[in-house]
Amino acid sequence: MVRRLLISLIRAEARRGRNQILPEAAFTGDPRIDEEGLGFDSLARLDLIGAVRDFFDLSRTGIEDYVYVEPTLQGWIDRIMQHFDLLAARSETAQAVFRTSGSTGTPKPIPHPWPKLMREAASMARDQGLVPAPGGAVIGLVPAHHLFGCLFTALLPELAGAALRDLTAAPPASALRTAQPGDLIIATPHLWAHLGAAGAFPPGLRGVSSGAPMPDALWHSLLAAGLEDLTEVYGASETGGIGLRRAPGAAFTLLPFLSRSADDGISDGPAPLPLQDRLRWTGPVRFVIEGRLDQALQVGGVNVRLGHVKSVLEAEPGVEALALRLGGDRLKAFVVCAADAEAGLEARLRARAEAGLDAPARPQHYRFGRALPLTREGKARDWD
């Protein structure tokens, strides 16, 4: 588990710092974590140690000082295990610290105690049967240092005694070329769309999706392409998993260790969960999602705050009003501009988005008009 999580953090820092994708072969044996080994110079190595410290909460024991002098991957793993042992000796609970997937500002740290993460992964395996068939493997397309990936590609394979094939550094379609009957594919809707576009699925494959809503049309197309079944897990970085469903258009079923509270929220024991969405209950443990509470959309598994995107784009001279919606799996924008401002405005908006917004928050399609699209009742509506 620790090795899988550590490799995921290393890959993320390599991509963030120098836009390099480290293949699986780079981690064969016990590679050195330096410039000659995995390509981290002294400054990049410090940044990586900081990311590892924050995720594993190493400051509680001070073990990051010892990680700094360890030259190899296995040395880092040993020190992280020592951190866990020190906390256990003090009767303290270890935790992983995830980050919200927000596209604006600094992502918030969200600590999750390891026992609760293990409980959720065990429930997914034991209660929900989300494990590979005997002899099958978990095929991971999502990073393990994100909550969804941690649960399903780090903890669940270990609990189920299943092999893991980590394809986060490979094209999504490679999952179909290497898959065997009984395998379980872990991916976000954005990645599932790429898998669906790659052709027919080999027989006997099952899947799990999370990180963003799974569109019904995509779900139907995956089943038509030969995917045996798909389970969508609903949750958030702030809460962990909350519910799941096994058919498009169905209500979600609350996970068994959670409960509906008196105010129609959700509780984990006595603690209310900080829900990100409005829920409508259709039964004692079944609910449907009716939209975000914070005016955010999920684009490629990343929370995009529409208010921030609007404020960035509306600052462009000539923009009088602007509306944002999902168009497929990316944002689209409808722009009302001054009569003499449309020429060149799209190029300027794209440049402003490139400079001021993360990739998921940048609209891919722009449309211009004299007024924002409204229904007869004066409510905002979609556009082609």
Swiss-Prot record:
PROSITE patterns, alphabetized: AMP_BINDING (PS00455)
UniProt-listed Enzyme Commission number(s): 6.2.1.12
Signal peptide: none
Broad class of enzyme this protein falls into: ligase
GO molecular function: 4-coumarate-CoA ligase activity; ATP binding
Keywords: ATP-binding, Ligase, Nucleotide-binding, Phenylpropanoid metabolism
Example GO BP: phenylpropanoid metabolic process
Annotated catalysed reactions: (E)-4-coumarate + ATP + CoA = (E)-4-coumaroyl-CoA + AMP + diphosphate
Function in brief: Converts p-coumaric acid into p-coumaryl CoA. This is necessary for the activation of the photoactive yellow protein (PYP) chromophore.
Family the UniProt entry places it in: Belongs to the ATP-dependent AMP-binding enzyme family.
Protein's UniProt name: 4-coumarate--CoA ligase
Source organism: Rhodobacter capsulatus (strain ATCC BAA-309 / NBRC 16581 / SB1003)
